[in-house]
């Protein structure tokens, strides 16, 4: 789809990527930390194939900052296997809020929400170690809640504290994969907010103006 950008020949240390929906289309964008647009990819929805089509046009960076959209990790393994991943910490907190709500009612939920908020206070390796300890302490205190199951009236069985379990597993998996604190070793940004608040907002404004 036109217009298109020329080939990217420079290898960048950090690249921010995100997807934005415009009507029935999805636009995937890759930019540098100074918001230089490197490439974009139109698609019907976020998928491994769509992300791979974007990544294959750009030399693999040292770090990619992303929000973990559908298909992106498989595409990264395929096209940029050696690139380090930094999950956008803003989106991590938003995902936790969706699972736990703004005001969790249980002690377990409240404590896990506090651990999520503490991500923004991790500035050193020592801070990261202490944060990981908080996560382990939470598991020792409340981990059994994530395993409890309930049989419902229709005969189906599900996790009793499903939202709590999802919030816990989000932090657990990101911690295991070392996707939370990449910035401590590589000096990259922690979020894709510059991309969302800059270029993406500009696109939304233009689309609203022309009625797209």
Located regions from the model:
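Alpha-helix boundary/capping residues
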Residues: 58, 103, 206-207
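Acidic/histidine-rich catalytic cores and adjacent linkers
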Residues: 63-69, 73, 113-212
């Amino acid at each position: 789809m036109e217009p298109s950008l020329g080939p990217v020949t420079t290898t960048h240390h950090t690249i921010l990527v995100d997807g934005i929906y415009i009507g029935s289309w999805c636009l995937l964008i890759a930019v540098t930390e100074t918001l230089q647009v490197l490439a974009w990819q139109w698609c019907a929805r976020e998928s491994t194939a769509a992300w791979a089509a974007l990544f294959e046009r750009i030399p693999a960076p040292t770090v990619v900052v992303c929000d973990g959209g559908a298909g992106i990790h498989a595409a990264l393994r395929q096209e940029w296997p050696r690139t380090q991943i930094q999950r956008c910490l803003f989106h991590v907190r938003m995902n936790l809020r969706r699972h736990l709500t703004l005001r969790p009612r249980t002690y377990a939920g409240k404590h896990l929400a506090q651990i999520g908020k503490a991500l923004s206070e991790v500035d050193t390796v020592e801070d990261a170690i202490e944060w990981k300890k908080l996560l382990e302490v939470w598991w020792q205190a409340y981990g059994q809640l994530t395993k409890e199951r309930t049989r419902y009236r229709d005969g189906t069985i599900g996790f009793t504290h499903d939202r709590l379990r999802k919030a816990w597993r989000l932090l657990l998996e990101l911690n295991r994969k070392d996707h939370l604190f990449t910035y401590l070793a590589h000096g990259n940004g922690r979020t894709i907010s510059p991309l969302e608040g800059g270029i993406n907002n500009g696109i939304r404004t233009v689309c609203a103006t022309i009625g797209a």
